[in-house]
Amino acid sequence: MARGRKLTMSQSERYLGSSYSYGDSNGNSATDESELTEEDIWSHAVDHSPEMLESHGAWNTRDAVVRNGRVGGGLSLAFEDASSSPRIVHQIRGGGEGGGGGGGGGRVERQLASSAPVNVPDWSKIYRVNSVESIHESDEEEEEDSGMMMPPHEYLAKSQQRRSRKSGGGGSVFEGVGRTLKGRELRRVRDAIWSQTGFYG
């Protein structure tokens, strides 16, 4: 700070506005009308019933407002739709304060998270493909050394060899390539190798 200057506004006034001060409830009426208070925002959503207050008399922020059998609070009250279907509300037995079962205050309504039933299609029947279990069984039958790990390019090469043995094809990398491996022919061989090993350039 510069030596010759006085700080004319406190930090709270600088950040929160000039009409704000701690503990000053007798502020200027013109500025008080333009300022929002907590009651302006939360008065319609707050239900000051005795059930909503804790035993200490303080507001319990975890409890929500119960309206029309639904539990909600905050923005959910602003977007409340009367035409929406009712939700399942589970009743939970709470440990009553003061011991005995008198007064009927042991039941507390709270809405638990639940999802709507979802129809999950069976894609194996739709696309008529083998199930995952049958694919794994066929892999186990064909693979001689099931305990060893192998790199992906070797795995693909072995699976290609198995396919070519079953189909009766030759062991050549690319069928029909001429003698010379110059220029275009070399590119075709390279692309064929990449397509069969799974590494595309």
Curated annotation (Swiss-Prot):
GO biological process: leaf senescence; response to abscisic acid; response to absence of light; response to salicylic acid
Compositional bias per record (Low complexity), positions renumbered to this chain: 17-29
Pfam families in alphabetical order: Senescence_reg (PF04520)
Subcellular location: Cytoplasm
Entry superkingdom: Eukaryota
Keyword presence, Cytoplasm: yes
Induction (free text): Slightly induced by dark, abscisic acid (ABA) and salicylic acid (SA).
Keywords: Cytoplasm
Cytoplasm among keywords: yes
InterPro entries: Senescence_reg_S40 (IPR007608)
Gene Ontology cellular component terms for the protein in this record: cytoplasm
Location (main, coarse): cytoplasm
Span list, region Disordered: 1-39, 134-178
Protein family per UniProt: Belongs to the senescence regulator S40 family.
Protein name as catalogued: Protein S40-5
Gene this chain is encoded by: S40-5
